[in-house]
Amino acid sequence: MSVLPFVRGVDFTKNDFSATFPSSMRQMSRVQWLTLDRTQLAEIPEELGHLQKLEHLSLNHNRLEKIFGELTELSCLRSLDLRHNQLKNSGIPPELFHLEELTTLDLSHNKLKEVPEGLERAKNLIVLNLSNNQIESIPTPLFIHLTDLLFLDLSHNRLETLPPQTRRLINLKTLDLSHNPLELFQLRQLPSLQSLEVLKMSGTQRTLLNFPTSIDSLANLCELDLSHNSLPKLPDCVYNVVTLVRLNLSDNELTELTAGVELWQRLESLNLSRNQLVALPAALCKLPKLRRLLVNDNKLNFEGIPSGIGKLGALEVFSAANNLLEMVPEGLCRCGALKQLNLSCNRLITLPDAIHLLEGLDQLDLRNNPELVMPPKPSEASKATSLEFYNIDFSLQTQLRLAGAAVPPSMPSSATPKDSTARKIRLRRGPRSEGDQDAAKVLKGMKDVAKDKDNEAGAVPEDGKPESLKPKRWDESLEKPQLDYSKFFEKDDGQLPGLTIWEIENFLPNKIEEVVHGKFYEGDCYIVLKTKFDDLGLLDWEIFFWIGNEATLDKRACAAIHAVNLRNFLGARCRTVREEQGDESEQFLSLFETEVIYIEGGRTATGFYTIEEMIHITRLYLVHAYGATIHLEPVAPAITSLDPRHAFVLDLGTHIYIWMGERSKNTLNSKARLMAEKISKTERKNKCEIQLERQGEESAEFWQGLGMTSEEADAAEPPKEHVPEDYQPVQPRLYQVQLGMGYLELPQVELPEQKLCHTLLNSKHVYILDCYTDLFVWFGKKSTRLVRAAAVKLSRELFNMMDRPDYALVMRVPEGNEMQIFRTKFAGWDEVMAVDFTRTAKSVAKTGANLTQWARQQETRTDLAALFMPRQSAMPLAEAEQLEEEWNYDLEMMEAFVLENKKFVRLPEEELGRFYTGECYVFLCRYCIPIEEPENGSEDGANPAADVSKSSANNQPEDEIQCVVYFWQGRNAGNMGWLTFTFTLQKKFKAMFGEELEVVRIFQQQENLKFMSHFKRKFIIHTGKRKDKAHTAKGKSPVEFFHLRSNGGALTTRLIQINPDAVHLNSTFCYILHVPFETEDDSQSGIVYVWIGSKACNEEAKLVQDIAEQMFNSPWVSLQILNEGDEPENFFWVALGGRKPYDTDAEYMNYTRLFRCSNERGYYTVAEKCADFCQDDLADDDIMILDNGEHVFLWMGPRCSEVEVKLAYKSAQVYIQHMRIKQPERPRKLFLTMKNKESRRFTKCFHGWSAFKVYL
């Protein structure tokens, strides 16, 4: 059955119908529009007379001289386009204008010398175009009858006047009289044309004497064209036309414009090119809607452009070429909407610096300015705020949402330093227009509503305490795979209430039409989506996948898989429900208004491979150059088609022969070989054999492929030159198949720059590419099945309409499996294969060769939740004492060893708890952990007395013995101690205690709480080694200075030796200062000061005294307790290097936090260190963020990456914004510090700061 009777419209543009016109056109009895442009028609085809329902006919750019006959029989014709032909008055029948439905007539660009006879009978005309003819006069009756005209174009004729009846055109909106000799005509009919919106009088010899002074009476006039006249100045009546939107005054003799231009408040386009203007009026800057200003070829200089031009906030195009400009005002760079700026052919010396801030500028023309020196670009640092950091949104609102925290209702803006560049950007934006102000009001209202919702959902507590992050549900914490669902579903799916159904075809979901909803094939599977609104007005979904009884395994599996993909695509929380044929749930059946209908068989094909014999048709292609690429043009597979100047490709399916003429170019030969390789790889699975054939050396198989033997080829005439030198293949025509309710349409796709690009192909549609010798039907992946079937039939009809050679074919091309012959018809389609030799082929196939472009399209994973977590609170003293008591109660025995002379020896009892930074210690701890006895009684109601008697009969359970070995390594100790322990002492311990032995390696100031509890807060760290007696440069015993401090609780109390300097004192802490005396017998005599700060707590004051008495328990040492302010000048301050200012409080201890920024997990994360952090937590490979409550430091390790630097910088900014909301009374400033360049404000946050450990 032919589909031509169902065709409603078709575009045959650029088809050659000069020889014969398709007779099958008669079958298109329902066609309503028909385009036959550029079809080389010399007369009206007879077949058009059968198209009785034709309403729109276009025949422009043909060779028509007469249109007698068939057109007059088209009673439904409403629009007729006959422009660009060779029509004369004698070739237009008067009967044509008897068509009552005719409303649009275009006879422009013909050879008419007068208005066609009988035109006045076409009383229903609303559009009439008679331009570009040779008409000398308009007959009086014409405008008496054509009073409904809306558009009238009489330009480019020889009219000297218009009839008085022109005033009857009261409905006329567009009147074009351009380029007519109307010097003696004053247009007195204008006041009657009150509906006129467009008036074009270009080249009508207007002067001040014959200018229509009544033009200001046209209340609806929007566009006025007065170009190409001899106006020395603009008449005053033009200034009074306040409704003007577009005004063209180019090619006149204007020397000035008055201040009256400010009346044109609606003006959007003003063309003043090619006049004698010296200056533009300042009132021009008062036109808020002006978008285009053209002042080319005038006499403007720097002073001629008003300085207030920056007020034109809507200006998009400014062109001032061929003037006398040496400089332009800086205000021009404040036009934020400027897109095109033309200053060519001037005398420019330089431009304002703000020219670089015009971010929306697309075109900048500065040619022919030989003395121009461009200003330097502003510093890139000023633009850092607008840079994107690896596709990560570092806004505080976004990061709070990702972390699961409540977004505060108000976000205060940070105080930023003044920036001249930013100020210029703000000035460039200019004042807001009325539309912007209205939009701002709407935006403010939306913000207020959002604030109210935020106050209800997650308001900040009144007590000011930081909120704890609510833990996510288990299903929310599951990581969703980063998949691109756009290949399966469209953006609009699930966004509107209703029912949407997909069928599974070739492993993929394919949306079906609404008319077949509720009709399921037994051999298919479907995905059903129900979209609705819930009680809160939010979208809600129900997802089902239906399984037919006869469906294949691949369809069943893919239905379930893509149902889950649909849920992930929508972000739905619902389940995907499985429905089987004959066992559907009531919920599923209620989705359909009628009963579900089962249809036998299957509508879609399985995705599994089916083995079938491939039938290859012998094709011979002519290889010809087309720009930088080549095209393969099919020719007849015969020896007569060969040309010695060209290369040919003979495709036999399993074999491809490259025939090279004796005078063919090597470039074409090599590209033909490359094309054959592509065909073999992409279409034949590399199983095709490629063979080169040179002229005169052809093989017998080659001639056999052309249907002849070698003897016949030798007897035949050799190939001759028959391909024309200027050979051009037929320009392909791309049609889009459109399907409606009972009709088909076949419009042509408009080609940008007349080039076929593969980007024109949309996956939702079906296209027909007509190349004359080949006709391709391209199926988009998302196109419907009905459109595909219609396209196949329509392509066959289109193929038969034209006289094509015998070797022409119709081929189907599915999206994603396009053949190379099809690809060569498009410019730049897969000419170069993506290759990156630094990565695997699988990686390149997944991301493409351009890894940077792929990365910009990805959503980078980050974890900044630690920045928004509340600070870890300090452990209360009572809880610390309880833990210390419990852990020491379980401790049955602890033996201590120290590395001495490459072996571990027992540590003297008096040195327990005293550590040295250059030593390694081993502690063997034996814990006796009691096993809790089961409670008496049972859940099943058994007799308790029986249980007691039973338990007494059995032996009591023994306590669990646990052995733990702690290996403590000082900061300055090498790894030799750990190796010695591993190969000696650890083996002995394992032999004694078996596999139950637990070994814990700990480093200085990174001890766990259980280990430190065994020393009962008397944990002392000395500098150096045990038996090395330190001496100063003068040979004296050095002064020892110890600092007592606890980080995050009493269990982390340490007494650490630091550099003796008064600057380290702090009124909140306690210190021990040992000043040795010089003696001849080398006895350890001296004086010990216990310095107690005025703000130190009583517990630490008592503790430091006990430690001092234990450390320096010698009759030769004097112990003194000093309160802050009672220090003796002689020994105390001299030992500390003199009196110096020091801190009087340690408020930072309540705010100090340390974060680590790293990429070690494969993505950027920020993790917080525990409150008991130390100097060794500063890793060289990472970046650390330190907050002391007053400053935020960004510490850079020497081996950190540039990526971490950028991301950590943005993270610190987000953290500061967050803390500004949480603690507005403590604003923080951001500082940068590097390793070995830390300031006192940074180092005071670390207990026992010293030189960094050197790694060998």
From Swiss-Prot:
Spans of repeat Gelsolin-like: 512-589, 633-703, 749-822, 1168-1242
UniProt LRR repeat ranges: 4-28, 29-51, 52-74, 75-99, 100-122, 124-145, 147-169, 171-192, 218-241, 243-264, 265-287, 289-312, 313-335, 336-358, 360-381
Expression sites (tissue/organ): Found in ovaries, larval fat bodies, brain and adult thorax.
Region (Disordered): 405-476
GO terms of biological process kind: actin filament severing; actin polymerization or depolymerization; adult somatic muscle development; barbed-end actin filament capping; gastrulation involving germ band extension; myofibril assembly
Similarity comment: family membership: Belongs to the villin/gelsolin family.
Record-given protein name: Protein flightless-1
Species: Drosophila melanogaster (Fruit fly)
Gene transcribed to yield this protein: fliI
